[in-house]
C-alpha cells in the first residue's frame, strides 16, 4: 500500500508561510519519501523568494553541480546586505535601547502603547522618533526573510509593545512573531503568540471591514500554524482538543475549509487518556465529515466506535503506524499512539465481552499471545482493572467493581447500548455480504 496518498505535506503547505514549509520538506528529504531532486527543486522555489541567498546558492550547487552561480544571485547578495545595513542604521537608537535591560524592564511595565511612545519620545537620551516603529517592523521582516529568526522575534516583540492594535501592521506583527518563535522552537513563546493571535482574530481585531470569509481564512491559517505548537508544547495535547473540537468557530473552519485536520485532532484524543470524554464528540465530527475526508486514523476511530469491527480496527492500526511514521507532526507520537490505540481496542472489547480469549485479543492488538498476556498483566496492574488472567485456559476474566444501584443501572444501560450497536453492525455487515451485487464487488462508504 502506498502511503504517499496520505501525505498531507503539500495540502498543509498551502496554509503556511514559506519559511514554515521548509522544515516539512527537510523531513520528507530525510524520509526519502519523494524524489530528492524534486524536493531540492521545491526548496529552491521557496528560497528564491526570500533573502536567504547563501542557502539558495547551496541548493543550486546540489541541483546543478556543473553550473557556476549566476551573476544575478551574486549581485542580489550584495543588495541584501546593503539594504539590511540601511534598515539597521535607520533604527540604531532603538537597537541600542534594546540592549539595555533597565530600559526594557521599564518598557515592559507600560501596557499602554501611547504612554510608552510618549515616554520614549520625550526622553532625549533615547533619541527615539515615532517613525522608527515602522522602520523596526520593516527591519524585523527583512531579518525574517534572511532567516535570522531570533533577531526577527526580538524586533517584533518591541513592535508589539509600541504598536497600537489598530496599527495597519499589527496583525502582520502577530503572525511574524508566531512564525519566528516556531522556527527557533521556543514553544512557550509560540504558545503565548498563538493565544494573542487567536484572541485578536476572534475579537474582530483584523478590522471592522474584515468579512466573515476573511475571518474564516485567518482561522484556517491559524489552525495549520498551531500544529507546530500543539505537537511540541507540553500542554499541546489538551489545548488542541479545546481549540479544534470545543471552539465552534475553529471547528467550523476545520469542517468547512480543512477537514484533513481531523487527523491531528483524532490523534490528540487517542494519545490523551485524560480526555477520553472527548471521544463521543470526536466520533460525531468524524462521521459528519467522512464523505469529505478519511484516512487510516479517522477510519480506526470509525471501525472501533461506530462499527465495533475489531478486525477492521486492527488492520487500520497497522496502517496508522505507517501514516504516523511519514507525518512531520505525528512521528514523535508513534509509540504513544500504538499503546493507547491498543488500550482503546481492549477497553471496547471488554465492554462487550466478559470472558476474553488471549489469543483473540492478541490478534486484535497485533501482538503475539505471550506479548499480549504480558501487556494485559501490566495494564491490569497499572490501571488497577478488576480482571484476572486464567493462563491455563488462556482467558482474561473481567470482574465487576462494587457500584451503587444508580451506577449499576447506568453501567447496564451503557453496556447494553454498546452491545446492541455491535450486534446491529455485525448483522448489517452479514446482510450486506449476503445480498451483495457481484457486478460491483465490495463497496466501502
From Swiss-Prot:
Biological processes per GO annotation: formation of cytoplasmic translation initiation complex
Principal subcellular localisation of the protein: cytoplasm
Function in brief: Component of the eukaryotic translation initiation factor 3 (eIF-3) complex, which is involved in protein synthesis of a specialized repertoire of mRNAs and, together with other initiation factors, stimulates binding of mRNA and methionyl-tRNAi to the 40S ribosome. The eIF-3 complex specifically targets and initiates translation of a subset of mRNAs involved in cell proliferation.
Organism from which the protein derives: Bombyx mori (Silk moth)
Gene Ontology CC, one term: eukaryotic translation initiation factor 3 complex, eIF3e
InterPro entries: eIF3e, eIF3e_N, PCI_dom, WH_DNA-bd_sf
Any one GO molecular function term: translation initiation factor activity
Subcellular location: Cytoplasm
Pfam families cross-referenced by the UniProt entry: eIF3_N (PF09440), PCI (PF01399)
Family: Belongs to the eIF-3 subunit E family.
PANTHER family in alphabetical order: EUKARYOTIC TRANSLATION INITIATION FACTOR 3 SUBUNIT E (PTHR10317)
Domain PCI per the UniProt entry, residue ranges: 230-403
Protein name: Eukaryotic translation initiation factor 3 subunit E
Amino acid at each position: 500500500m502506498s502511503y504517499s496518498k496520505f501525505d498531507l505535506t503539500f495540502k498543509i503547505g498551502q496554509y503556511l508561510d514559506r519559511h514554515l514549509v521548509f522544515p516539512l520538506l527537510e523531513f520528507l528529504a530525510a524520509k526519502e519519501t519523494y524524489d530528492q531532486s524534486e524536493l531540492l527543486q521545491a526548496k529552491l522555489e521557496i528560497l528564491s523568494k526570500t533573502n536567504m541567498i547563501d542557502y539558495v546558492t547551496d541548493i543550486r550547487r546540489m541541483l546543478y553541480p556543473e553550473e557556476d552561480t549566476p551573476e544575478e544571485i551574486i549581485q542580489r547578495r550584495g543588495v541584501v546586505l546593503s539594504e539590511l545595513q540601511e534598515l539597521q542604521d535607520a533604527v540604531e537608537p532603538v537597537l541600542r535601547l534594546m540592549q539595555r535591560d533597565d530600559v526594557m524592564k521599564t518598557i515592559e511595565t507600560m501596557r499602554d502603547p501611547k504612554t510608552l511612545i510618549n515616554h520614549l519620545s520625550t526622553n532625549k537620551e533615547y533619541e527615539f522618533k515615532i517613525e522608527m516603529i515602522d522602520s523596526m517592523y520593516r527591519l524585523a521582516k527583512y531579518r525574517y526573510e534572511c532567516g535570522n529568526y531570533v533577531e526577527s522575534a526580538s524586533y517584533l516583540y518591541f513592535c508589539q509593545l509600541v504598536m497600537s492594535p489598530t496599527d495597519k501592521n499589527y496583525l502582520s506583527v502577530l503572525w511574524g512573531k508566531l512564525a519566528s518563535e516556531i522556527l527557533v522552537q521556543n514553544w512557550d513563546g509560540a504558545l503565548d503568540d498563538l493565544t494573542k493571535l487567536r484572541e485578536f482574530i476572534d475579537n474582530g481585531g483584523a478590522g471592522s471591514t474584515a468579512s466573515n470569509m476573511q475571518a474564516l481564512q485567518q482561522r484556517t491559517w491559524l489552525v495549520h500554524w498551531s500544529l507546530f505548537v500543539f505537537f511540541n508544547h507540553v500542554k499541546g495535547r489538551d489545548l488542541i482538543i479545546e481549540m479544534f473540537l470545543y471552539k465552534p468557530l475553529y471547528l467550523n473552519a476545520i469542517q468547512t475549509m480543512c477537514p484533513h485536520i481531523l487527523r491531528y485532532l483524532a490523534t490528540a484524543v487517542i494519545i490523551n487518556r485524560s480526555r477520553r470524554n472527548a471521544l463521543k464528540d470526536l466520533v460525531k465530527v468524524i462521521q459528519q465529515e467522512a464523505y469529505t475526508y478519511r484516512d487510516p486514523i479517522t477510519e480506526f476511530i470509525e471501525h472501533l466506535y461506530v462499527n465495533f469491527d475489531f478486525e477492521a480496527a486492527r488492520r487500520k492500526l497497522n496502517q496508522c503506524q505507517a501514516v504516523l511514521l511519514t507525518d512531520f507532526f505525528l512521528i514523535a507520537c508513534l509509540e504513544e499512539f500504538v499503546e493507547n490505540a491498543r488500550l482503546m481496542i481492549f477497553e471496547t472489547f471488554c465492554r462487550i465481552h466478559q470472558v476474553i480469549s488471549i489469543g483473540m485479543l492478541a490478534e486484535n492488538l497485533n501482538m503475539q499471545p505471550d506479548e499480549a498476556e504480558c501487556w494485559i498483566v501490566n495494564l491490569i496492574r497499572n490501571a488497577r482493572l478488576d480482571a484476572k488472567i486464567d493462563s491455563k485456559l488462556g482467558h482474561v476474566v473481567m470482574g465487576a467493581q462494587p457500584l451503587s444501584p444508580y451506577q449499576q443501572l447506568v453501567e447496564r444501560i451503557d453496556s447494553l447500548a454498546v452491545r446492541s450497536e455491535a450486534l446491529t453492525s455485525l448483522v448489517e455487515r452479514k446482510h450486506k455480504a449476503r445480498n451483495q451485487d457481484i457486478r460491483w464487488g465490495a463497496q466501502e462508504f
